[in-house]
Curated annotation (Swiss-Prot):
It comes from Bos taurus. This is Lysozyme C-2. Monomer. Residues 19-147 form the C-type lysozyme domain. Residues 1-18 form the signal peptide. Pfam families: Lys. The keyword Magnesium does not apply. Lysozymes have primarily a bacteriolytic function; those in tissues and body fluids are associated with the monocyte-macrophage system and enhance the activity of immunoagents. Its EC number is 3.2.1.17.
């Protein structure tokens, strides 16, 4: 019985933690999902963005008290403008997606929303990209990856 309880907690912690991508694994996944060069944004820039936004973690969240909104998932997509979490006041839901879907291990919906955001606002919609990736050599983010 004790072993079952421990096993249950182990599975629960994996479910809560989500998937933390290895850098090259994420590069291959983003390329497969069509982000390499999408709207002129290189794969290396997407890797830099996701590293600084979420450390490649699909379950990452960050609450923003000033806007009473939350950023979700590997791209840290905001509930005020892009997804519906059912609790953010005056949310727009521009991607027409539940915020919880942006935290799935299968990141196809998160990528689709990121494509929508970059189509409307460009890569500068992400503060982490402006702070850590813009005007930097980001080639190291894809270096050594078999793409």
């Amino acid at each position: 019985m004790k072993a079952l309880v421990i096993l249950g907690f182990l599975f629960l912690s994996v479910a809560v933690q989500g998937k933390v991508f290895e850098r090259c694994e994420l590069a291959r996944t983003l390329k497969k999902l069509g982000l390499d060069g999408y709207k002129g944004v290189s794969l290396a820039n997407w890797l830099c963005l996701t590293k600084w936004e979420s450390s490649y973690n699909t379950k990452a969240t960050n609450y923003n008290p000033s806007s009473e909104s939350t950023d979700y998932g590997i791209f840290q997509i905001n509930s005020k403008w892009w997804c519906n979490d059912g609790k953010t006041p005056n949310a727009v839901d521009g991607c027409h997606v539940s915020c919880s879907e942006l935290m799935e291990n299968d990141i196809a919906k998160a990528v689709a929303c990121a494509k929508h955001i970059v189509s409307e606002q460009g890569i500068t919609a992400w503060v982490a990209w402006k702070s850590h990736c813009r005007d930097h050599d980001v080639s190291s983010y894809v270096e050594g990856c078999t793409l």
